[in-house]
Regions:
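Hydrophobic packing residues within well-ordered alpha-helices of enzyme cores
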Residues: 66, 150-153, 270
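Active-site glycine-centered loops adjacent to acidic/histidine catalytic or metal-binding residues
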Residues: 239
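Active-site micro-motifs of SAM-dependent methyltransferase domains
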Residues: 10-12, 54, 169, 207, ...
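Charge-dense, low-complexity intrinsically disordered segments
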Residues: 25, 53, 117, 176-179, ...
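Mid-domain alpha/beta scaffold segments of enzyme catalytic cores
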Residues: 1-133, 145, 180, 192, ...
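Catalytic pocket-lining loop regions of alpha/beta-barrel enzymes
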Residues: 119-235, 244-251
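Secondary-structure boundary/capping positions in well-ordered alpha/beta enzyme cores
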Residues: 73-76, 104, 160-161, 199, ...
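Mid-to-C-terminal alpha-helical segments outside catalytic/metal-binding sites
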Residues: 1-6, 19, 27-46, 224, ...
Length: 296
């Protein structure tokens, strides 16, 4: 089994500034730390790094730092941080990627913006500049209102390749008290998937469960995504280290409360589910991410 993890975070608070970090996540997660977690993950593996919300002024520094680790970690592509609503400054920022060949896409973290932000002229101008450069957009949203914003974005900008992070962050409950997919979320996912340039990451649900998750709990959500997108537009993502925080880590902030086997456990859960549905496991674990991000 080979695994191309489409959603990896790396950071070092001694190198860059991340105001949002707290609890067990306020630590270094870089080459040395991930080396101890991936020994059992696949016969062949690679990663797509996704920006980790450092300070905006450090976005290019983040790319350069991750690039310095790329060979050691196995990073094959970088989804860079960018504000798409800065007009000429956005264009200059995107043009700086030309000297940074690992950059394959951008994430402007929409979950921190108000509903409707993705329809503003300033954001749309930046999104158009992104599409013109052949770069992808990672849409990280929460709630049906923001999901509807991404549906509208996809409908009105078919030239922009979009991937939905973390299935849109649905409410999943916990392993002990699991939730079933809501009709609103399922309908929104189906509407989004109607646009063929949109893909979806099977990622992030352990964090939504606050570290208390089970493979069985995730399957109804995967099934909705499969029905909507088909097996050719789904990709696995570990969301490491955020989704590696254990329930005790979320509850107490304990410094050591991370699951060392989280990357492998998530890949195994996705692979087992895909096999049980008789769909192409390698597509979801590898080739779809490679195709979407156009990794060489």
């Amino acid at each position: 089994m080979r695994v191309l993890d489409s959603h990896l975070h790396l950071w070092d608070p001694s190198v860059l500034d991340y105001p949002w970090l707290e609890g067990p996540l306020r630590a270094r997660f870089a080459a040395e730390e991930i080396a101890g977690t991936i020994g059992e993950v696949g016969d062949e593996r690679g990663f797509v790094f996704v920006q980790a919300d450092c300070l905006e002024a450090q976005y290019l520094d983040e790319i350069d730092w991750v690039t310095s680790l790329a060979e050691q970690v196995g990073v094959r592509g970088i989804v860079a941080g960018a504000r798409l609503d800065r007009g000429a400054a956005t264009v200059r920022h995107l043009d700086a990627f030309a000297e940074r060949p690992l950059v394959v896409g951008v994430r402007h973290l929409l979950q921190g913006e108000p509903v409707g932000f993705a329809a503003t002229p300033a954001f749309r101008a930046g999104a158009a500049a992104l599409a013109e450069r052949g770069l992808t957009f990672d849409a990280c949203v929460r709630g049906e209102g923001q999901l509807r914003d991404v549906i509208r974005l996809a409908a009105e900008m078919p030239e922009l390749r979009i991937v939905l992070d973390h299935l849109g962050k649905p409410a999943v409950g916990t392993a002990a008290t699991p939730s079933l997919p809501s009709a609103e979320w399922a309908n929104a996912l189906t509407a989004l998937a109607a646009h063929s340039q949109v893909f979806c990451k099977l990622s992030g649900l352990p964090a939504e469960a606050r570290g208390s998750w089970s493979a069985e709990q995730t399957e109804p959500f995967f099934d909705v995504a499969l029905e909507a997108f088909g097996p050719e537009r789904l990709m696995v993502g570990s969301d490491w280290p955020v989704s590696a925080v254990t329930a005790s880590g979320w509850n107490s902030g304990a410094d050591a409360a991370l699951d060392a086997g989280a990357i492998g456990a998530w890949a195994d859960a996705v692979a087992s589910w895909a096999a049980s549905r008789a769909v192409d496991v390698d597509a979801i674990l590898w080739s779809n991410a490679e195709r979407f991000y156009r990794l060489s």
